Amino acid sequence: MGIIEKMRLDGKKGFVTGAARGIGKCTARAFAEAGADVAIVDLDIEEAKKTAQELQELTGRKVIAIQTDCTNKEQVDAMVKQVVEELGGLNFCHNNAGICINAPAEEMTYEQWLKVININLNGIFLTDIAAGKYMLENGGGSIINTASMSAHIVNVPQPQCAYNASKAGVIQLTKSL
């Protein structure tokens, strides 16, 4: 049996946040190509629907779109419930939603700082907890959180203090689960 066969996800169900485009879209595609049913979770519901349709046509898997603000606990809880109901379970999640605001620390506003930390770190916490509770009650699962090399290495000058701090937080949060 080759490595591709060993990595099959046939019958698995999961979601990817920030999946309408970019890294999230690529990982959702990889999960679907490996045999999983996937929810495309994003704030931009129109792009999420396009991605879901594209991946469903490409892979033949069940792919749905769910609009969710990952910084809103009620929306995150409702999203996890919807994934379970529409896909028939939850075996994995990939928390990928994130933003970067480029501004030197001395020019960044507190509101900008909070926005980055809220989406990149608090959003992952909320999603990890909601998905993790379901997984623990139902035999386990896998949680993947997108971090960044910027959590470890800061190229000077790099005007991304909130982004770097948020991604370092994601690494420590993930280790603490």
Regions found by a protein language model. Give the residues of each.
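Conserved NAD(P)H cofactor-binding loop of Rossmann-fold oxidoreductase domains
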Residues: 96-101
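Substrate-binding pocket helix/loop in short-chain dehydrogenase/reductase
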Residues: 104-105, 112-117
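The beta1-alpha1 cofactor-binding region of Rossmann-like NAD(H)/NADP(H)-dependent oxidoreductases
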Residues: 45-46, 67-78, 110
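Active-site helix of classical SDR
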Residues: 128, 166, 174
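Residue(s) in the substrate-gating loop at a strand-loop-helix junction
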Residues: 148
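Conserved glycine-rich Rossmann-like NAD(P)H-binding loop of the short-chain dehydrogenase/reductase
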Residues: 36-50
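Canonical Rossmann dinucleotide-binding motif of NAD(H)/NADP(H)-dependent dehydrogenases/reductases
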Residues: 9-38
